Amino acid sequence: MGRNAEFGTGRPIENHKHTIDSQTMKFLLLTPPLTQLNTPYPATTVLKGFLQMHKHQVAQADLGIDLVLGIYNRRFLQRLFASTGNPVGKPGMQRIYANHDRYVACVDDVVRFLQGKDATLAPRIANRTLLPEGPRFDNMADLEWAYGTSGTDDRARYLATLFIEDIADYIRETTAPYFDLIRYAEHLAAYAPEFDEMEAALNAQTTIVDHLLIDILSQHILACNPDVVGFAVPFPGCLYAALLCGKWVKDNYPGTKVVIGGGFANTEWRSLAEERLFKYTDFVVIDDGELPLLRLAKYLNNEIDATQLVRTYYLENNAIRYSGNDAENIPFAEGGTPCFEGLEMGRYLSMAEVTNPMHQLWSNGKWNKMMLSHGCYWAKCAFCDTCLDYIARYDAPTAQQAVDRMADIMRQTGQSGFHFVDEAMSPQLLKNVSTELINRQMTVSYWGNIRFEKAYNAELCNLMADAGCIAVSGGLEVASNRLLKLMNKGVSIEQTVNAARNFTNAGIMVHTYLMYGFPTETLQETINALEVVRRMFDEGIVQSAFWHRYAMTAHSPSGREPEKYGAVRTTFEPNPFCNNEVDFDYDFDYDIEAVGEGLKFATYNFMNGLGLDRPLRKWFRIKVPNPKI
């Protein structure tokens, strides 16, 4: 089936024309697949709230949850298994196919359970008599250790998630090689200096998942007849779907304009030189989208010319133009309250990919995602994109304004849990917001990113806990005071440990982000860092952690002046398509890939309370030194 063929309700309306009011426009703002399945991603909600303040008509949809619900139902699975037959040569997939009738029979029930609509299914799922068990069940956690005899709901959620993941694996192995539950063709955009591979995938034969996605898109367009379709692309795993959908809109609704923005554009497309991209979109906007979309509406209404567009790429005479006006922004306090209309919380799935309760927060719970403040109040870390607006421009509202927004969002969604998605919430703002919540006697739960500052003493941590803080996440990074100073992190191991202890004593869970492979880091320093992490787990002052390998980016201090950090960039020439991660030379005198594997292996076990007494060298497949702390 070609990309412009009719399927479902995807047939274009003949002679589709827009009558654009001089004052208002119709926007359809979309989050392409896939982000998270438990709650809406916080981009279109912000833009919808703002644009509606300016009298525009705005519809929004999460194509990710739409797509997943379109897949995980009896009708689709019947079509899927009928189309694949028994997948010869793939034993794991044959195992699933052998039980395909049970997958079809159970899928609607599992979805209802994960949506929170049928809690009575928990005992059936938990006792392992209801669900077929595919390859994902072969490596599951020790359920008795993780949940004991009382954690029936949590145990059932974990098993139901394995069931969902088995089906995702089956789809990927048999029909749609790009499909995953939280990303879609991520490898095509994760590091893409050239557009060729992405375009080849977009022009290849469509899969059953692609067809379903376009069918869903077409229904949204028919429902609101938009003048502008906007795609918020936060991650590489959302880009393929955004371009696939954008091309379909341009081909079938030439009167409708397509615009792409979001975190991916902000970091990757600041030197955009790939004209072919504009076969899939009409405009690309970078950084905060409120003012660019407001100006774009005026431009499309012929109220301003292109010189007044804000941070917008467009094609003119087959050449890319950039509008500039980079410094113009809407003050954060004037952005309005995010609007969740069109994103029904009851449709989302609370998953449990791991048994660790802190780690589960990212996938379990229908959190109201919102920013307390814009940017990072520190914005000095050498590995971070500190020259970009989303980091560099710190802008915080008053505590009263922040809590007013929280109260408004609670009324909209019916949920009292908040995930603050700030780059880093400041201790002072958290103190003020917590005090305001207590004074208003508002019952909420909240969590988000912090820096392990000295300000997080016992008094502040207890205040935050009393106001509803349940967890924090922050960076210990390389866990070496020498390297923390080199990267200008602004924290030390000692103050991180003290802050983590104060949070834990207040009943607040702690997750820490960790890093390895920073230039000049020795193997001894890496092993010492793992020992710091082991001790924090052993003391119980951190509940969850994750190691990232250092990546040099073009917009970070270490990418702009690599020689200050002992590294050499191999090229400063911009790529035509994506420009964020850059290649660099540093000669580590050890196998960094093997070290990364050992760090992650050890920490995964620490998170599950295992191996805390095991010698660190036994987590690695290469010879490593003993820690020296």
Segments and roles (model prediction):
Residues 26, 34-37, 42-78, 85, ...:
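Glycine-rich beta-alpha loop elements in corrinoid/cobalamin-binding modules
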Residues 362-400:
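Canonical Radical SAM [4Fe-4S] cluster-binding loop centered on the CxxxCxxC motif
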Residues 60-72, 265-270, 274, 482-487, ...:
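Flexible glycine/acidic-rich beta-alpha junction loops that bind and position SAM and/or redox cofactors
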Residues 198-201, 209, 318-369:
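N-terminal [4Fe-4S]-dependent radical SAM core
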